Amino acid sequence: MTHSLVCPETVSRVSSVLNRNTRQFGKKHLFDQDEETCWNSDQGPSQWVTLEFPQLIRVSQLQIQFQGGFSSRRGCLEGSQGTQALHKIVDFYPEDNNSLQTFPIPAAEVDRLKVTFEDATDFFGRVVIYHLRVLGEKV
């Protein structure tokens, strides 16, 4: 059964937050299921989100909802187990719109993920994400 794998024990980190305003634009808004809140990165050549899960997971899908005009043309999902180095799982290519986009992921058993957003549609390299979901199952 596929379900959301991000839980309260999942540790998340992000590359940046717009104007360091974590209250309004922080990483917690990626997972709060609120249509009114978002993570807004600061400017830069690429942005990323890392997730450390409390147990081994098998990822099957990645869901992302960007704000149109502040999306990424190319993304990379990397993962690892324990202290191993991250390895590339898959590249994905989001569309520049406001829709929730689903990307199938080749079966990967990991406890750490890194999602990197490259080639932002915004001139300054900012990325705005309303929802980030990792779907799959616990191993």
Swiss-Prot record:
SUPFAM superfamilies: Galactose-binding domain-like. InterPro entries: Galactose-bd-like_sf (IPR008979). Expressed in all tissues examined, with highest expression in heart, skeletal muscle and pancreas. The keyword Cell cycle does not apply. Interacts with NR2C2/TR4. May act as a repressor of NR2C2-mediated transactivation by suppressing the binding between NR2C2/TR4 and the TR4-response element in target genes. This is Nuclear receptor 2C2-associated protein. It comes from Homo sapiens.
